[in-house]
A protein has these predicted regions:
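Extended, folded cores of ATP/NTP-driven motor/assembly subunits in large transport
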Residues: 1-431
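P-loop NTPase motor domains
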Residues: 73, 80-99, 106, 110, ...
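Hydrophobic anchor at the beta1->P-loop junction of P-loop NTPases
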Residues: 469
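Conserved lysine of the Walker
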Residues: 477
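Hydrophobic positions on the alpha1 helix immediately C-terminal to the Walker A/P-loop
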Residues: 480
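Post-Walker A helix-loop "phosphate-sensing" segment adjacent to the P-loop in P-loop NTPases
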Residues: 487-497
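Conserved AAA+ ATPase "SRH/arginine-finger" region at the nucleotide-binding site
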Residues: 518-522, 737-746
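Conserved P-loop NTPase
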Residues: 755-811
Length: 813
């Protein structure tokens, strides 16, 4: 190789001197290859080099960033103590990042067109008798949707930026940073997750295509990593808008939309923790960005000391001037004294408290369809800033840098900074209230009273979908249950069964095409308490659970305060095993046992304890209350079934509710086999928890329901009685949904202690209007308002106010 090189060198022609024209030509080619440093395409303007599938983004040679999405927490409704805890956790959050890590907090409110209401709410025309109700329901939801601000999707992100030698080093460091960040969000109660590359691109696409949110038919983000190689495109081609225009000094254009970026001048001595929330409540597309970079602690202390030294020098100069002028040297300019005291306080905080110093750049970007709308949006935000003694100032001649600095990439080209301590920085609280706006079979439950956003949730997605509804008479308790029942029938294929002690649900059930079963001594509709099916239990022997029900029933009719004795339980269980043998040998309806068979099996044992139970059963077999001593005559195949037990009277009401609950369990086990859920609504639920044995059986059913696709809901106007039951803990632990309306003073106190409700939250169930209260779902607590338009057919079906019910009946007649 060396010899070849030598021969080449020997034969090479001697270099000649380039002419001036040749040098100019080469210099022109080099300049053209290097470019002029300006972006010539939309893609060139987007300030990053590479986006990787794991979400790591390379901004330039050594700078990398990752983005984490986080959700809201109930800060505004929290108690002062909880707010203080969140504030302290925010301080720890920022203190956890050293000066080598850039932090960008992004709060976005962007309009997104959801398309037709029927697609959003799942209410579709079926061409049947329920279409008028569907149209009515869709109109009501449309009305509530327009009242709220659900067209605007609010999202929150934090983008972290570091420098590293290469990709491997960046990934290794981010692995630690991500874990720490997610843990800090968890401490604050905020759910968070790291965005992957596609999610980050979709986020950027949404910001760079602001007009697409108003066009449901187009503009959706479409991308796959496998498309890059065959197409020869880069990731920027999938997110780039049609055009950027930065020809004006105070505005810019993205495609057909107008935008403007402003910065916040923090001139107030103190900032209120509501300022961020109020920025996000203004109308229009808004993106609030905070670029935060920590200052080395030693450098921060030196900087403050230099400032104090400068202020002291100014103080001495003022004092000398005072002496020369012949007035008191202790009289100093007020600003000088104020700044001097503030600087010393900051120094003390840095040296003795857990305070650090940060540089903050605060940007606010607006987008609108016209310049006029843009100026209105900017002026609204400026008014918010002015309310808190700050100034929102437009970036002159820096709109492009402002836009690129607002993108959640971790890049800050705007060097307008304000130095703040940790406590001063954490006052910009990014939390307001949690939202519930779920997909799937989500149904309407009112508007969030804090944000005015619609509440859409799917109880079946919860770990335990069981629910409770609390409310005083006239608070809207029954109407809330009716509204939920209506939307279940209109938007799902699930079954619904109602236990109606006061005959309040019959008109609604009939209008929705359901079946009303009236249970009373004079009725010919019979339900056999001893009905069973082979799927009655998930255990091998379905009689184990059925025996529990029979024990509960016998204890209820015997009225023993101390409960059944051990021998009594034994003889009942023995009789149960015997009477079901013919049915399991030949499972035909005529072989199903009835209460008379149970009584005979008890008497056949010939012992006093069995005779005592049989004598208690005699009233329900041969006496005046023999209504339940029949085989079932009703066919419960309708999707919507209402058991009207008002006619049972006082003596039969509790047994009737227990028997209905067991009948529901039978239905649940049957429907699970075909993959269909069964919702069960029981009013006056506290009656089932008054007696020890019926309470134990109800709690057991409550636990079993969720495993079998059942969704029970207990409603009561007497939460005090409900909460005094020894089984209430089992009920509450298996109920992730609580709909709490107005409460009496005594009940409020008990509920607050039991459910951990703060005084601020309790105000929403104190003398509240009908349809207003608190909603508990999983770990979320939201105040809600459910004001239905009254001039609709659906409202007339839902209302239980006597005057409105009477008026509706007269109108129908």
């Amino acid at each position: 190789m060396q010899a070849k090189t030598a021969r080449h060198e020997k034969t090479a022609k001697p270099s000649r001197k380039l002419t001036r024209a040749e040098r100019k030509q080469i210099e022109a080619v080099v300049r053209q290859a290097k470019g002029d440093g300006k972006a010539h395409t939309v893609q060139d303007s987007i300030p990053f080099r590479n986006m990787f599938p794991d979400g790591l983004c390379r901004l330039d040679g050594r700078t990398f960033s990752k983005t984490i999405a986080f959700e809201d927490v109930n800060y505004r409704l929290a108690s002062p103590e909880d707010q203080r805890d969140i504030f302290e956790h925010l301080c720890d959050f920022y203190n956890g990042y050293d000066p080598t890590i850039g932090v960008q907090v992004s709060l976005s409110s962007r309009y997104v067109e959801h398309g037709p209401e029927e697609d959003l709410f799942g209410i579709h025309s079926q061409g049947d008798d329920l279409d008028p109700i569907r149209e009515d329901a869709a109109g009501i939801l449309r009305f509530q949707y327009e009242r709220g601000s659900n067209g605007y999707v609010k999202t929150k992100y934090v983008t972290l930026t570091i420098e590293a030698e290469n990709l491997a080093a960046a990934r290794a460091r981010f692995a630690r940073i991500e874990t720490d960040t997610l843990n800090r969000f968890k401490v604050m109660g905020a759910a968070a997750h790291v965005l992957d590359g596609k999610e980050r691109l979709e986020l950027l696409h949404g910001i760079l295509h602001p007009a697409d949110g108003r066009r449901p038919e187009g503009g959706k983000f479409a991308f796959d990593w496998d498309w890059l190689a065959p197409s020869g495109l880069s990731v920027k081609d999938f997110i780039a808008p049609s055009s950027f225009h930065f020809g004006e000094t105070r505005t810019f254009r993205i495609g057909e939309m107008y935008g403007a970026v402003s910065f916040l001048q923090i001139t107030a001595p103190e900032i209120h923790d509501r300022i961020l929330a109020e920025f996000m409540e203004t109308e229009g597309n808004i993106l609030v960005t905070m670029h935060i970079r920590g200052i080395n602690q030693n450098e921060a202390i030196k900087m403050v000391k230099r400032k104090i030294t400068d202020l002291d020098a100014m103080k001495i100069a003022e004092q000398k001037r005072a002496v020369r002028s012949g007035y008191d040297m202790d009289i100093l300019p007020s600003d000088l004294a104020t700044y001097g005291g503030a600087a010393k306080t900051i120094l003390q905080d840095l040296q003795s408290r857990n305070e650090r110093m940060f540089n903050l750049t605060f940007l606010v970007m607006h987008m609108a369809e016209t310049k006029q709308k843009l100026e209105i949006a900017v002026s609204q935000a400026a008014s918010v800033a002015q309310t808190y003694n700050c100034l929102l100032t437009r970036l002159d001649f820096q709109q492009e840098d402002g836009l690129m600095s607002s993108l959640p990439l971790g890049l800050n080209r705007i060097k307008i900074e304000r130095s703040l301590t940790t406590s001063a920085l954490a006052v910009f609280v990014p939390f307001v209230t949690q939202e519930l706006f779920m997909g799937g079979d989500a149904m309407y439950y009112g508007l969030n009273a804090l944000s005015n956003n619609m509440i859409l949730l799917d109880r079946k997605q919860s770990r335990s979908p069981n629910g409770l509804v609390f409310g005083t008479p006239g608070s809207g308790k029954s109407m809330s249950c009716k509204r939920e029942i209506t939307f279940i029938i209109l938007t799902t294929k699930d079954n619904v069964i109602i236990c109606d002690p006061e005959d309040e649900y019959s008109p609604l059930v009939k209008r929705l095409g359901g079946q009303v079963i009236r249970l009373s001594p004079s009725s010919t509709d019979y339900v056999n308490p001893l009905d069973i099916n082979l799927n009655y239990s998930d255990e091998e022997n379905p009689l184990a659970l059925k025996s529990d029900f029979v024990l509960s029933f016998c204890e209820l009719i015997m009225g023993s305060k101390t409960g059944l004795e051990a021998i009594e339980k034994t003889v009942i269980d023995r009789a149960v095993q015997k009477i079901y043998q013919p049915y399991f040998a030949d499972p035909r309806p005529e072989n199903m046992p009835i209460l008379g068979d149970l009584m005979e099996a008890l008497l056949a044992q010939g012992i006093p304890e069995a005779d005592r139970v049989a004598q208690a059963l005699d009233l329900y077999v041969n006496g005046s209350l023999n209504f339940f001593n029949h085989r079932t005559t009703v066919d419960i195949r309708n999707r919507l079934v209402c058991f009207d037990i008002k006619g049972l009277g006082k003596n039969l009401k509790k047994p009737g509710m227990l028997i209905v609950q067991d009948a529901v369990w039978n239905t649940v086990t049957i429907k699970r086999a075909i993959g269909r859920s069964t919702w069960y609504f029981v009013d006056e639920f506290h009656l089932l928890l008054k007696e020890e044995q019926t309470a134990a059986y109800s709690a057991e059913i409550w636990k079993r329901f969720r495993k079998w696709g059942g969704v029970p809901t207990g409603a009561t106007q007497n939460p005090k009685d409900l909460l005094s039951s020894p089984e209430i803990e089992n009920i509450l632990e298996n109920s992730d949904f609580i709909y709490m309306l107005n409460q009496a003073a005594g009940d409020r106190k008990i509920l607050a202690e039991r459910l951990g409700i703060s005084a601020e939250q309790l105000a929403y169930v104190t003398n509240s209007e009908p349809g207003h209260g608190l909603l508990f779902f999983n770990n979320v607590i939201l105040p809600f308002a459910d004001d239905f338009p009254k001039d609709t057919e659906l409202y007339k079906l839902l209302t239980t106010k006597p005057s409105e019910v009477e008026h509706a009946a007269e109108t129908e007649a």
